[in-house]
Amino acid sequence: LALPPGLSLAGVSDRAMKKAESVPFRGWYFDFVLLEKHRIKDSTPMTPVMPLIYALDVQLDRIFAEGLEARFARHEAMAKRFGSWAEANGMPVMAAPAYRSHTVCTVQNAKGWDISALNKFLTTKGMRIANGYGEWKDKTYRVATMGETQMSDIENLIAALEEYMKL
């Protein structure tokens, strides 16, 4: 959806709602019964993050204007483009081709780049990448190929990375 974190959406079937009614300690966050009671009254059980709701409204307009199939195809094309470039430059994509995400490309940091230093360079060009998590923190880096990212953004990132490799 290309939104900041902090908003959850859920679809709950009649069967799941019936089951939720019989759960004695539903907690607060996932109490579908409480949420449904408030939904019927067009209210919420807690203060909602209104800027995110407005942002969701804008994003849904963008998504539907582009069309889901076109959006998914764009994400896939960007992921393939970046992955192909990375592999051609000796940096393997971490997942096997059949299992690769179309929304984020995770690449082995085979060049041994200091991702913090790389990001300092990239921010001068208005972009940044993310390193991996946990034990993969310095061994991988991630490039977003989703949301409002466009192929031109990927091409600009590739050009910047090629410039960085020459430094």
Descriptions of predicted regions:
Residues 90-94, 128-132:
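A short linear hydrophobic-aromatic micro-motif
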Residues 117-125, 157-162:
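Short amphipathic alpha-helices in soluble, non-transmembrane regions
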Residues 76, 92-122:
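Conserved PLP-binding catalytic core of the aspartate aminotransferase-like
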Residues 12, 107-111, 145-147:
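Short beta-strand-to-loop capping motifs
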Residues 1-4, 97-98, 134-136:
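Solvent-exposed alpha-helices and their adjacent loops that cap or buttress functional pockets
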Residues 135, 139-167:
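PLP-dependent enzyme catalytic core of the Aspartate aminotransferase-like
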Residues 1-84:
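Active-site C-terminal subdomain of aminotransferase-like
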